[in-house]
Design a protein with these regions (language model features):
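Active-site neighborhoods and metal-handling regions in enzymes and metal-associated proteins
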Residues: 1-266
């Protein structure tokens, strides 16, 4: 395992890439409503990212099981946990939830963040799933400080979500991030206190709880990208890119614009 500690200059570049991801998610939030296709959202995202002089990292991202990813964002609706492919056939409906995962490459460094949006009015049980998943993200981030261990992050996410009876997906993880979108180490959403590698200042991590309302078992659709819950219950996904610091992690990405647009914090 090769982990790259970032310099302050590199962190500054990563901050710019991640701020662009946050701005892109906020721009997409303006378009999320019943009747909109996920293909439209993808076109909005790609234009917005390229207009800022950046590259949408996910476009043509390689797939060990099939064709490269064909779009600029992942649009995962309801029971799709991650990697949903934008399509003109996927039309948002009132009561849906959609997780939009976005990555940018700017000045040689990557940004990565995901937000699960409500489409119109959603049920109270789905609202709680979103709330708890987002809470677990920040509880995990609280553990991402120098001197703690990688397992402390996963333990915080897992214990919070499981007390509500939710499933914590095991096969998918967060990751290190920097010049490459996916670097070491993998950041699991489960674990035990004090386990795993020691966290050091300058590590940049994408922490991303992927939480299911029902069973944690998942499956791969024939498109070789979309991963769904086997029981077809909804899933939520929130992600921030952070840098490990002494005392308190620094969050490089941002939900501020998205939450301002929503008018409330989930």
């Amino acid at each position: 395992m090769q982990i790259f500690l970032k310099t302050e200059d590199e962190i500054n570049l990563m901050r710019k890439a991640n701020q662009l991801v946050g701005a892109t998610l906020a721009e997409l939030g303006k378009h999320i409503k019943p009747g909109v296709t996920t293909l439209h959202l993808d076109r909005v995202a790609e234009e917005f990212i390229r207009d800022q002089g950046a590259i949408p990292t996910f476009k043509n991202f390689p797939n060990p099981y099939g064709e490269p990813f064909p779009a600029s964002i992942c649009t995962s609706i309801n029971d799709v946990v991650v990697h949903g492919i934008p399509s003109e056939k996927d039309v948002l409906k009132d009561g849906d939830i959609i997780s939009i995962d976005c990555g940018t490459l700017l000045e040689g460094f990557n940004g990565d963040s995901c937000y699960t949006f409500a489409v119109g009015e959603i049920t109270s049980d789905v609202q709680q799933l979103l709330k708890v998943t987002k809470e677990s993200l920040y509880l995990g981030i609280e553990q991402a400080v120098a001197g703690k261990h990688l397992g402390d992050i996963g333990y915080a996410v897992q214990t919070h979500c499981q007390q509500y009876g939710y499933g914590v997906v095991r096969e998918l993880t967060g990751h290190g991030i920097g010049r490459a979108m996916h670097e070491d180490p993998p950041v699991r959403n489960y674990g035990s206190r004090g386990s795993g590698i020691l966290l050091k200042e300058g590590m940049c991590l994408a922490i991303e709880p992927m939480i299911t309302m029902g069973d944690r078992q998942i499956g791969l659709l024939p498109d070789k990208w979309s991963i769904v819950t086997r029981d077809r219950q909804p899933a939520a996904h929130f992600e921030h890119t952070i840098v490990v610091r002494k005392g308190k992690a620094e969050i490089l990405s941002s939900f501020v614009e998205v939450e301002h647009l929503e008018g409330q914090k989930i």
